[in-house]
């Protein structure tokens, strides 16, 4: 099973927020997921990014691939330093 860490869109029309989830790469964007590890709200000022770092590191070390957007969010939150990459 190819696993990705990606964003799942939630919220109202024109007021989105996103949950950071671990999901099978073949499932739809808002479909089934394995685990929820955090959320991202781009609408608020300042932008809110909260996630469980331990779960994120565990999934990445087990082979989960973060999408480009999630990778940028992790870098912004300082997770890159904890992974040693």
From Swiss-Prot:
GO aspect biological process, one term: translation
Gene Ontology molecular functions: structural constituent of ribosome
Swiss-Prot/TrEMBL keywords: Ribonucleoprotein, Ribosomal protein
GO cellular component: cytoplasm; small ribosomal subunit
Lineage top rank: taxon: Bacteria
Record has Zinc as a keyword: no
PANTHER family xrefs: 30S RIBOSOMAL PROTEIN S16 (PTHR12919), SMALL RIBOSOMAL SUBUNIT PROTEIN BS16M (PTHR12919:SF20)
Similarity remark: Belongs to the bacterial ribosomal protein bS16 family.
Name of the protein this chain belongs to: Small ribosomal subunit protein bS16
Native organism: Clostridium kluyveri (strain ATCC 8527 / DSM 555 / NBRC 12016 / NCIMB 10680 / K1)
Gene: rpsP
């Amino acid at each position: 099973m190819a696993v990705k860490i990606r964003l799942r869109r939630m919220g109202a029309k024109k007021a989105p927020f996103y949950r950071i989830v671990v999901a099978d790469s073949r499932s739809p964007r808002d479909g089934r997921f394995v685990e929820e590890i955090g959320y991202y709200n781009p609408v608020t000022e300042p932008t809110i990014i909260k996630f469980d770092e331990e779960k994120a590191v565990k999934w990445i070390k087990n082979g989960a691939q973060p999408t480009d957007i999630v990778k940028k969010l992790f870098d912004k939150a300082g997770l890159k330093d904890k992974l040693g990459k």
